[in-house]
């Protein structure tokens, strides 16, 4: 196991390139199951979640190859509806997309209940409601979801809560169903449009992706195609916040600026200079920071995935700011770690109250989930002294080559192997 060491206090300057979107990739890869011929996906990020999904597709008979320029080619022609009740499937939150894709192609699936980041209750009841409306019989047996259907028929499905995962999963199950499916109160995230674009290129008939009503007319079969993933707006937002935190000038390259309007607006409100053009955003962090309040909302609101990194930034602002997470109320595990670094933060219900400015101090901290990891890396870069971050496996799930990318901006950051004693101490902590 490795740990990350960061020497803080340096202003970061330069250009950092964003990879393909993790939250798209983990849905696009299972989508390939629905095709009869090979699918090529370009811009695939080199992260552990992607590798694990590729391995899962091979477990069910797919052939997965990695080509030039971050390309992944999936040949789904020999796939079978093999049950996946245990193993890798349980380590990966996004493995639930295998349910919709396998149900759509094979009319049956057995998928172990997924893991990923532990952010409190993240139920899949809306997914199941959608599958049942399409005609599937769904049971939960010994920690695995069993899905079976004689046939899938289009239905009108109203989501009780706006859910990206449920919206995508129902789309996957519905594209080869008989008749029309209408998803109402659908999520509008860019990643949903990305999945719909791939499905349409494969021959699906989908209208309304990116709005709150999606209409799908089922087709008998889908074919292979070539698709390029959208840039990762969460990775881009992380580096925008990092630029503001470090006091230098950082240009974030390969972005779609309209996907980041909520983040841009909040940074500007905090007094950060932000300039956007077609596919780049430049953040200048050398001004005094004003305090702002953040409230996470579904897209196009402020993303829950950037709440933790922004909380770190607020330790540098003058005054008291409130960060409220309306999406995942349990997403505050990074706060205790930031407190170890001298941050003045208290948690009340779904809100973190941040008082600044304080100079963060280097410390030994542990990432408990992916975006907490990003928050702690930013904290380490802001802090006085050396910060040691463990729990790197969480960061590697969602950030491609983060060490090399940050070194390119002038950060002093490196990985080291942990000793046996350190690993034991971490497990017992």
Swiss-Prot record:
This is UDP-N-acetylglucosamine 1-carboxyvinyltransferase 2. UDP-N-acetyl-alpha-D-glucosamine binds at residues 93, 122-126, 305, 327. Its EC number is 2.5.1.7. The gene is murA2. It is found in: Cytoplasm. Phosphoenolpyruvate binds at residues 22-23. PANTHER family: UDP-N-ACETYLGLUCOSAMINE 1-CARBOXYVINYLTRANSFERASE, UDP-N-ACETYLGLUCOSAMINE 1-CARBOXYVINYLTRANSFERASE 2. It comes from the Bacteria. Transmembrane segments: none annotated. The modification 2-(S-cysteinyl)pyruvic acid O-phosphothioketal is found at residue 117. The active site is at 117 (proton donor). Pathway: Cell wall biogenesis; peptidoglycan biosynthesis. One of its GO terms (cellular component) is cytoplasm. GO terms for biological process: cell division; cell wall organization; peptidoglycan biosynthetic process; regulation of cell shape; UDP-N-acetylgalactosamine biosynthetic process.
